[in-house]
Amino acid sequence: MRNLMIAFALTFAVACNNQTETQEETAHDDGSTHVMEADTRTAMSTDPDFTIESAAHQQLLRDFYTAYINLKEGLVAADNQRTDRAAKEMRTIITDASFNELEGEAHDHIAQMGRDVIRMVEHSDVEEQRNYLNSLSTSLFTMLKAGDIQTEAYLQHCPMAFDNQGAYWVSDKEEIRNPYYGDRMLKCGSVRETL
C-alpha cells in the first residue's frame, strides 16, 4: 500500500509539472465561451528548423502578414466585411505557386496556413473565423521567424479563449487588442514573444 501511495504521489507531481508563468496575464471573464475546433496547438513551439532566404518568398510573407494584420483587426472589431476581404487576400497570397515551392517544415506551415485561411473564407461569421486563428497564428509566427522579414511581430496569448484553453495571435504592435473577444475583453492577454 505504501508503494502504491508513493507511486501515486510521484505520478501526480510529474503530471502537475508545477511551472510558474513569467508573463503577467490580464484576464477578464465575461461569461462567454468559444468552441475550439480543428486546432490543438495550445502548447507549441515557434522555433523553425529552417530559414526562408529567397527575396521573393520573404516578400510574399510580408504581404501575407499585412493581410493577416487586417484580418486580426477585423476580428477585434467583429467586422465581417473586413475579415472576409482580408481572408480572401490571404488565400490569394498563400496559393501563389512560388510560395508553395517551399519544402519540409516550411511547406507544412504554408499548408496549415492555407487550410486555416480557406476555412476562414468558407465561414464568413467572425465567431467561426476565430476558431482557426490560433493555428494560423502559430504557423505564421514560425514563418516570420524563419523569414527574418525585418518587421515587428508580437506573439500574444489570451488565457481565456476557448474555455480557458488559451489561444495565440500575432500583432504588429505590443499593445494587447484581443481578436478572440474584441471589445468584450479587449485587453485580455500578454505578449509571449517578440521579433
Indicate residue ranges for each PLM-predicted region:
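Sec-dependent bacterial lipoprotein signal peptides
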Residues: 1-14
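Post-signal peptide N-terminal segment of mature Sec-exported envelope proteins
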Residues: 24-52
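Bacterial signal peptide processing site
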Residues: 16-20
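Mature extracytoplasmic or organellar-lumen-exposed domains after removal of signal/transit peptides
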Residues: 45-49, 53-195
